[in-house]
Amino acid sequence: MEGGTAHYSPRTVEEVFRDFKGRRAGIIQALTTDVEDFFQQCDPEKQNLCLYGFPNEVWEVNLPAEEVPPELPEPALGINFARDGMQERNWLSLVAVHSDAWLLSVSFYFGSRFGFDRADRKRLFSMINEVPTVYEVVTGNAEKQTKEMPSSANQNGNRSKSNSKMRGLESKSSKTIHAKDEEEGLELEEGEEEEDEDEDEHGETLCGACGDNYASDEFWICCDMCEKWFHGECVKITPARAEHIKHYKCPTCSNKRARP
């Protein structure tokens, strides 16, 4: 899979960091400069595809390694399946997030394999943390951070505000069905009646894929085109992935739009 770099094994902190930067540069190249080529290679009709970055700053879209367990940690599997069900920028952001996780896993795999002690691991993480993440580069947040450079106090404040906004967005999402939380000490008759009505309505909801009834402990998502509800598992959408989707189209609607 590594193509000429399969036997390359960095053994020092500096070598591992150099390996990290090379792989990171390749992935950024795929998600920015070569984005059209990358988009075309991630055909949803193909099998589970992964985005690989190599130490020589080359990227590749390919099937996962056949050997089990693989020689190195594997990147996110099946990035091509969500391509046509999301806006392109949201899909690229999702791939970037998973790529960041993969880059860290590869670096600390080398750290564990070659016995880095606590000081080495801390130094490696500090070196990695000094460069913007792939996600920050792809979304443009890296440039904003270099311009703003907020103080640590402001960073903590912004982090709290960001978390509160995320909670607000999750509670207001129109795409997912969540079981309502019971609020202790607040028993309003009108609220209880509304909850009963919602439960009756959701109980009659059928999955557009498998035809099963709605259950409160399952994740569901609604198609913005046909307005049908689907089990997340039936359409291969997770709650984490749904957060990045602004306008979801089910597989049937996606195929209809793709036809000439």
Swiss-Prot record:
Descriptive protein name: PHD finger protein ALFIN-LIKE 5
Zinc fingers (PHD-type) by residue: 204-256
Residues recorded as bearing N-acetylmethionine in the entry: M1
Comment text on domains: The PHD-type zinc finger mediates the binding to H3K4me3.
Compartments, as annotated in UniProt: Nucleus
Family (UniProt): Belongs to the Alfin family.
UniProt GO molecular function: DNA binding; histone binding; transcription corepressor activity; zinc ion binding
GO cellular component assignments: nucleus
Polar residues bias locations: 148-165
Biological process, per Gene Ontology: chromatin organization; response to salt stress; response to water deprivation
Region Disordered: start-end pairs: 142-203
Segments of skewed composition (Basic and acidic residues): 167-181
Role description: Histone-binding component that specifically recognizes H3 tails trimethylated on 'Lys-4' (H3K4me3), which mark transcription start sites of virtually all active genes.
Record text on subunit structure and interactions: Interacts with H3K4me3 and to a lesser extent with H3K4me2.
